[in-house]
Every structure is written in C-alpha cells, then in structure tokens.
C-alpha cells in the first residue's frame, strides 16, 4: 500500500470518457472502477468530483453518493453561466442552493465558479462576471468553501474576491497558471492554490510554484483533462509511470486520458521543483485540504 495520502481536489469523474464514451460514441467498456482502483493503489483517499452546472452538479452528487471516498461540488463554471439565463436565473440559483444545502457532508464546496476570459466563445464576459458574483450567495448561505476557476482574468477575479471577502469562508483557485504576483494576492485573501498538469507547462509556471508557501498549496489532476505531456517543463521530474496504451486495453491507462492515479506525478514535479521531501509535501497538501474542505 502507498505511503502517500492524497485528496484529488478536482476530478471530473462524471466525464463520459471514464465510461468509455468519446463524443457520444462507446469506444471501450466502462472502466471507472479500474480508474478508481489505480488511484487508491497510489494513495488517493478522497475524490472531489467537480460540478460545473446545475445538471452536472446533480450528476456529481449522484456519483458521490455511491462511494464513501467520493465527494462533490455544486456550482456553475464560467463557460456555462449562460445557463442561468435559459430560464429564470433565480430558479437556477435556487436549484444550486438546495442541492448544496440538502446534501452537506457529501457536497464539500461551492464551484466550480469563477472567470475564464480565454474561452469567451462559450460565454461572454458580462454574463460570467454577473453570475460569478451571484454565486457568492451560495457560499454565504451554505458556509461552504469555494472551488474557483481563474483563466486570463486575474484583475477582475481579484476585484470580485475582494469585494465579497466577507461572503466566503475560504477556498482554492484550482488549476492555477497565473503569475507570482497573482498567487501572492490570492494567498493574501486567505485562498489556497491548486496545481495540476496544466499548472506545470512552462519554466515560468515552475517558478511560480516555488514562490507559494507549502501550507497554501493543494494538488489535483483535473482528469480526464490536464495531464502532464512530455513537452511540459515539469515532465522531466516524473519518476512514476503507469502501463499505458494508445488503444484501450484492460488494466492499462489510456494515452490521452488523464487519471486520478497520475496525482503521484504531480507530487513528484512539485516536490522536485520545490526541493522538498515528497512524503512531507504530500502530508502538508493532504492536511491543507482536510482543513479547508473536511473539518
């Protein structure tokens, strides 16, 4: 059994890829149980399943209820905030609120919410700003911490976080790829910073990672997305590999599908870059996460 203990704070277990479905087509058998088993083998103790819309949050919760190690978040991702306006925005918000309020213990965070100005083709800036701010009603009423998303929107994101400082009880900005200054400003607001493969692409990213106090860090995979690619600056620090096939085969990872077991690779990069003992860092990351989401 692994010496390491992990909480994967961002895992998209409701993604059809873990059921063998790609773009609506069944390509291989449902292997979710194998994916979970591989993660447990390397030390994942809790999985925080990300909710990215009202329906997605319902699906995440439903899956979370099938396993004691599974938990979920409730919120609306910035690229999907136009869903608020497909019917009544107040009704949509009320749906999110009742889901979070009625399932405490399984629902551990409000999110994924925030701003994403890299993908405005999915949802315009004004809509994102309006409904990110609206979701502080959820954090305020439930007193749950936040699971946050910030892409190419640091100034506006910080403005909103500062303005609503007394309406949230903490949280994490996941999949962080911002600057040292951005990280420091978020830490000043009492927030934690989550790292995954997308956070470790460039040498500049690695410099940012070095600058953040370990007691403000968390770890995640964002699987099936955000795997570490061989072109990423962080990849040279990976020691652990998994039997992987280009075409699906039982008992193997699949080449272009990230999995929660790969969290060990994120730890290896983080500990090497920061020159910290992997076990010590893993324990710090685990304790940070328990403190924010599970105590």
From Swiss-Prot:
Keywords, ordered alphabetically: Hydrolase, Metal-binding, Nuclease, Nucleus
Needed co-factor(s): a divalent metal cation
CDD domains documented for this protein: TatD_DNAse
Modified residues annotated as N6-succinyllysine in this record: 27, 46
Cofactor note: Binds 2 divalent metal cations per subunit.
InterPro entries, alphabetized: DNase_TatD-rel_CS, Metal_Hydrolase, TatD-like, TatD-type_Hydrolase
A GO MF label: nuclease activity
Primary enzyme class: hydrolase
Localization terms from the record: Nucleus
Amino acids binding a divalent metal cation 1: 112, 222
Cellular component annotations (GO), alphabetically ordered: nucleoplasm
SUPFAM superfamilies: Metallo-dependent hydrolases (SSF51556)
Annotated residues for binding of a divalent metal cation 2: 112, 149, 174
E.C. numbers: 3.1.21.-
PROSITE patterns attached to this UniProt entry: TATD_3
Protein role: Deoxyribonuclease which catalyzes (in vitro) the decatenation of kinetoplast DNA, which are circular DNA catenated to each other, producing linear DNA molecules. Plays an important role in chromosomal segregation and cell cycle progression during eye development probably via its DNA decatenation activity.
Family: Belongs to the metallo-dependent hydrolases superfamily. TatD-type hydrolase family.
PANTHER family, per the entry: DEOXYRIBONUCLEASE TATDN1, TATD FAMILY DEOXYRIBONUCLEASE
Protein name: Deoxyribonuclease TATDN1
Higher taxonomy: Eukaryota, Metazoa, Chordata, Craniata, Vertebrata
């Amino acid at each position: 059994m692994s010496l390491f203990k992990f909480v994967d704070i961002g895992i998209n277990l409701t993604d059809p890829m873990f059921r063998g479905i790609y773009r609506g087509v069944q390509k291989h058998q449902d292997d979710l149980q194998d994916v979970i088993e591989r993660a447990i083998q390397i030390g994942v103790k809790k999985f925080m399943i990300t909710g990215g819309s009202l329906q997605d949050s319902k699906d995440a919760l439903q899956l979370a209820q099938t396993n004691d190690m599974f938990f979920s978040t409730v919120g609306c991702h910035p690229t999907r905030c136009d869903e608020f306006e497909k019917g009544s925005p107040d009704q949509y918000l009320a749906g999110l609120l009742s889901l979070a309020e009625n399932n405490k213990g399984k629902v551990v965070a409000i999110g994924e919410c925030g701003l994403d100005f890299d993908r405005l083709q999915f949802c315009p800036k004004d809509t994102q700003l309006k409904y990110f701010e609206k979701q502080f009603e959820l954090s305020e009423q439930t007193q749950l911490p936040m699971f946050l998303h910030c892409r190419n929107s640091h100034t506006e994101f910080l403005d909103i976080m500062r303005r609503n400082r007394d309406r949230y009880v903490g949280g994490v900005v996941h999949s962080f790829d911002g600057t040292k200054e951005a990280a420091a400003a978020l830490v000043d607001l009492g927030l934690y910073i989550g790292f995954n493969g997308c956070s470790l692409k460039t040498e500049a990213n690695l410099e940012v990672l070095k600058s953040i106090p370990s007691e403000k860090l968390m770890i995640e995979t964002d699987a099936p997305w955000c795997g570490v690619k061989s072109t990423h600056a962080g990849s040279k620090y990976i020691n652990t590999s998994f039997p992987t096939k280009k075409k699906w085969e039982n008992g193997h990872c699949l080449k272009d599908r990230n999995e929660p077991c790969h969290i060990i690779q994120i730890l290896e990069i983080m500990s090497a870059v920061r020159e910290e003992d992997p076990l010590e860092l893993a324990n710090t990351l685990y304790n940070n996460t328990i403190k924010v989401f599970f105590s």
